[in-house]
Amino acid sequence: LNRSVLKFGGSSVSDFKKIKNIAEMLKTRIEDGEELIVVVSAMGKTTDQLMNNVSSLTSTPKDQELALLLTTGEQQTVSYLSMVLNDIGVNAKAMTGYQAGIKTVGHHLKSKIAEINPNIFDEAFKDHDILVVAGFQGINDDFELTTLGRGGSDTTAVALAASNQIPCEIYTDVDGVYATDPRILNEAKRLEYVSYEEMMEMSALGAGVLETRSVELAKNYDIPLYLGRTLSNMKGTWIMSKSDLLEKKAVTGVALDTHMMHVTISYPLPDNQLLTQLFTALEEESVNVDMISQIVNLEGLQLSFSIKDSDAHQISSILENLSTHFSALDYKINEAYVKISLIGSGMRDMSGVASKAFMTLINSDIPFYQTTTSEISISYVIDEENGEKAVEELYHAFEI
């Protein structure tokens, strides 16, 4: 069967004109003999508006009720798109995450997909040409609606592609994957191919075009992943395992993460109980920790790490609670930092990348406060005001 998953982000379906244009494009592909599973996000800023509504009512909504509310954004979009498709002669069916058989586990607002039954789609395609599925959502074992967290619609699309063993195309308001953010550097080049590994690093380190777990899912099931601009003839980027298609440069891209917070904790004694309680609480609240560094000496314990700024409420609550049990605990949460990262699979085989990056920042009068590395990336915590300057200096230094 000539079957694919297509996903359209919130900016691509932000108004009815765009939804109608997408419907016409989908009709053309159906007429060419394809069967399509279409995943959509909420229209434009719908999710933000729902959150603003909640803020007007309460500062402490229960996660279960909040998840239930947030799923309505995507459900509106699938209904609208399916209505338009049927109106222009395409036999379409709208499906919630629950109707699509997306079973989830974990936190109501950060659930993970546990299982998808592909037989649901085989049956549905007997009577329909297009299945329009609400992204970002599923249902848990208690029959409660859950959401998948940041990038959840991308994850939905890739998971559906994996369960059906078909390609996945993700359409948004960018032309593909760039070596760095073209909004920061106009000359940034678009990459025709990127390996799964490099894309995962770019996503994790702030590139923003795709969420890490959706790329990881594609890698695990070897699903070809395409990223392109909605309704554009310009070529996008293929994300795949064939790294031999890539240029063998040490550095493929530069990523700037502006959605981070830097946390520093000090305690006059090296106390393992403090660390145990801290990391247990972080795990329970599904707060991902990055760039961890720890110093233990005669003066006590100092721990630094970074988190996503979307976890601001959780980290504040966790640290306030710890302070009641460890009265000498001192902590600072700094939102005026950003993370600049170099990414490239060629780093495995080439030396001198770290020293060159170090000297570039020093010569550009850009101080950094923390460094971390992986096999194919190097990251620095720097002042927010130096973020865009660092992107430009490193991009040119490595002739990306």
Which residue stretches match the model-derived regions?
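Short hydrophobic alpha-helical runs that function as membrane-insertion/retention elements
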Residues: 167-172, 225-227, 290, 370
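A conserved regulatory-domain signal marking ACT and ACT-like small-molecule sensing domains
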Residues: 238-400
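Terminal amphipathic helices with adjacent charged low-complexity linkers/tails
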Residues: 41-47, 227-244, 300
